[in-house]
Amino acid sequence: MTAERTAGALALAITASVAALLSACNILQPAMYLAVGPTKVPARYVLENRPTVVFVDDRNNAIPINSSRARRAIADDVTKQLMSRRLVTQTISPRDAMALARNQDREGKLMSMQAIGETVGAEQLIYIEMLRYRGSPDNVTSQPTAECRLKVIDIVNKTRLFPPPGAERDWQAVVVQTAPVSPELYRSTAGRRQIEQLLVAAIAGQVTQLFYKHIPDELGSRLTPQ
């Protein structure tokens, strides 16, 4: 065999080997994904296991209709998820905290989160402030969207736990957008109530995800922390 033929045969053999290797990689990658699973996003903050209360505020009337109902639902849902995922072992009814604040507001007295936490017996308070809560991001697209910001307060030591002191921002921002919904839902009271429930679930779920390692959502609502 001539040197040229030998070199050609060697090149063909190398090419075949590389092709086989690449083919094997294409097979192995999905198999490895199934075996190991998708990469999880780490928690932004791990809550301390202390008596915790969730407070949802809407000082700027971001929720246009039934603000109190939506705020209670979000706070209740976050509280249930904290307990079900064992992120904390003791929570205080958010409705008690929000009712206390509402009663003080009626008397013209604005209570601080520190005072509310102390009064209801909490040692840790998750404060969520609603910034946007709409059935559509542009009044055209039928895709409910909401935005809020939050912080975790140490009631005992009177300091902010998350974001930590010295962080670039004092708040953790969360933007939530559900999957598109049928335009028909906007045309009835029952449909609009369903949209509200979708947003409540999306907000509560994405807020809670900040506190534990999780798989990023591929369908449904999406989280954009800033």
Regions found by a protein language model. Name each.
Residues 58, 95, 129-132, 148-154:
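A mature extracytoplasmic/lumenal domain signature
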Residues 1-23:
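Sec-dependent bacterial lipoprotein signal peptides
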Residues 25-96, 208-226:
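A structural "domain/chain start" motif
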Residues 48-54, 78, 121-126, 142-149:
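Envelope-exposed proteins and targeting segments
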Residues 90-134:
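Short, solvent-exposed, polar/charged sequence segments at loop or secondary-structure edges
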Residues 63-64, 135-139:
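Extracytoplasmic/secreted cell-surface and envelope-processing proteins
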Residues 70, 74, 78, 109-113, ...:
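Stable alpha-helical elements in mature extracytoplasmic
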Residues 154-213, 217-220:
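Short secondary-structure boundary motifs at beta->alpha junctions and helix caps
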